[in-house]
Amino acid sequence: MAYPTPQVTKATGAVFIPEIWSDEVIAAYKQNLVMANLVSKMSFKGKKGDTLHIPKPTRGTASLKAASTAVTLIADTETEVLVVVNQHFEYSRFIEDIVEVQALSSMRRFYTADAGYSLGKQVDTSIINLGSGLQGGSGTTAYNKAVLAGDGATPYVAGSTAGTALTDAGIRKMIQTLDDADVPMDGRSIVLPPVGRNVMMGIARFTEQSFVGDVGSGNTIHNGRIGDVYGMMVYVSTNAATPSTATDRIGLMFHKEAFVFAEQLGVRSQTQYKQDFLATLYTADTLYGVKELRDEAGVAFAMLG
């Protein structure tokens, strides 16, 4: 018997091959991650269970050894951080055949890019929101342990104390807060809302050639990049938190061990043809957990939005 025609082949059905969608989604997802690349990341992929146990040993202290005496034993009880992996987010589209047939090929590129953007934004938002618990904070949108960006020390009180513009003195004071807590200098970052970047570009110390030494196209005035500030890379994210006072925005200065991101299921892309609807269901999803790891390793600061 002759082979039936027409056939659905790999060429004619290429738009339904999951691997193509998946590759494009993962690329877009990685492009839109800011916070996830700046914190401690632990892979939970392929492992069963819903909770990750991370040992958190207490630092010991040295004791003076006197002659003819026994050594001093350290009897600390070690603790652990529990990361519950319960953040399961998905992005789905239902694409009818008539649209698939008549639409430009760019439609798929838009959906995959949009899926990557949406999932990446959600991951970053989950991590950024952990900043409300730094320095013993309540973990709410009140940000009761945040400081004012202007001086880096005055407590922020949502609803009664407005955020202030970021200053060089404020940055240096927050650096001292981390230094006083013995937070390692290597691995620190600053994440700002766009308004924070706007303010920093107006601070001569961070932009003008006489201070930073950059000339030509390497100067911040020409390229808009802040780059390295006192040994910390500066990143801008529109996902920066908005506290309960909606006119303010929250920035973070932190070490990578302030937060942990545990990923059990990386971005997965799937398609399923629904013949009864003559349409294709497309879904991208991810499963992860986030947690504050070291409370003293970061500072949240409030600025005017």
Cite the ranges covered by each PLM segment.
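Extended oligomerization regions of viral-like shell subunits
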Residues: K48, L52-K56, A169-E263
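Alpha-helical scaffold segments that mediate packing/assembly in large oligomeric complexes
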Residues: I98-T177, F301-G305
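A conserved acidic, glycine/proline-rich C-terminal tail/linker
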Residues: A262-T271
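Extended, compositionally biased alpha-helical segments that mediate assembly or anchoring
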Residues: Q270-G305
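N-terminal "assembly arms/tails" that initiate or stabilize quaternary assembly
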Residues: M1-V81, E296-M303
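Structured, hydrophobic secondary-structure cores that serve as assembly/anchoring elements
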Residues: A28, H53, R59, V71, ...
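Generic, well-ordered alpha-helical segments
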Residues: G46, K65, I74-A75, V85-Q87, ...
